[in-house]
Amino acid sequence: NLKIKKMEKIYSKIKPNKLLHIINRLSDIHGRNDVVPEENFIQCATLKMEKNKTFPPHKHITKDRHYQEQIAQESWVVIRGKVKCILYDIDDTIIAEPILEEGDASFTLYGGHTYEILEDNTIVYEYKTGPYEGQKLDKTFIK
């Protein structure tokens, strides 16, 4: 009697309309789904595809963009092992502690996070929006 975990969208308790974190589960992937709302800096879609599926060859266009504010948004995708996410609200209080298993992904749009590795030899892919301009301009630590 396995309980299937589903996608979680975690909103701020301080600003209830502000989406802070998304947890996407391997079991959530059916067809194409845009996981992160399009107004965010980081983008992710999941695609479940059958053999012989193809896409038209293409390249992406360079754009000249100027933003008033830009934040580094980050994602972890668990390839092997298990990871506990500790997710923070915008006031630095812990808001959720989901467990990621193989094929699951976390997305931090706003708020903070840390991770606890629960199994030896855990492997993750980490994705962040760039460009990276050094730790001083990228993050502040939560006490």
Task: Identify the residue ranges that each predicted region occupies.
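Short beta-strand His + acidic residue motifs that chelate non-heme Fe in jelly-roll/DSBH
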Residues: 57, 85-86, 106-108, 113-119, ...
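A short, N-terminal "cap"/entry segment at the start of jelly-roll beta-barrel domains
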Residues: 2-51, 143
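Conserved short histidine dyad/triad with adjacent acidic residue
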Residues: 47-70
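Short acidic-glycine-tyrosine-enriched beta hairpin
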Residues: 89-110
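Glycine- and acidic-residue-biased ligand/ion/polar-headgroup-sensing regions
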Residues: 70-88
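Double-stranded beta-helix
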Residues: 9-10, 114-143
